[in-house]
Regions:
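Formylglycine-dependent sulfatase
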Residues: 1-148
Length: 148
């Protein structure tokens, strides 16, 4: 896989397109995102059909509308076995990992670690939390590794 490029998908919540410098913001709020966008691939015409965090993330990961994958509001998890980008990249020989707020496991998972079956194919690296409140403070964040 050494000839294949690295792929990093950064998915921010509730961030307007015009708040990012590479898309025209003069405020210099996102210098690192801007630098990565200039060196990589950025999308100039894109939209989400579900502008709420968990449904939007589920749409991106599955390539489906919320009416197909079932995550039409926060608090609903992806179904175990749903095919995602992680599965596609893994099949192509990539190592796949996830870092950050997950918010796609069912509510009964609670505030602890997300069990492997609810990680939607991210099997090689996991550093995440299913609870928004655990990931909202930049200097006081709780993430769980693969072992919980």
């Amino acid at each position: 896989m050494s000839d294949s490029p690295n792929v990093l998908i950064i998915f921010t919540d509730q961030q307007r397109w015009d708040s990012v410098g590479v898309y025209g913001s003069p405020m210099n709020l996102t210098p690192n995102l801007d630098a990565m966008a200039r060196r990589g691939v950025k999308f100039d015409v894109a939209l989400t059909n579900q502008p709420v965090c968990a449904p939007a993330r589920a749409c991106l990961l599955t390539g489906q509308y919320a009416s197909a994958h079932g995550v039409w509001r926060n608090g609903i998890g992806l179904k175990v076995g749903d095919w995602t980008l992680a599965h596609c990249f893994k099949r192509a020989g990539y190592e796949v990992g996830y870092i950050g707020k997950w918010h796609l496991a069912p509510g009964e998972c609670g505030a602890g670690a997300v069990p492997p079956e609810y990680r939607a194919g991210f099997v090689d690296f996991w550093e995440a939390s299913n609870v928004l409140e655990f990931t909202s403070k930049p200097y006081d964040t709780t993430l769980f590794d693969a072992d919980g």
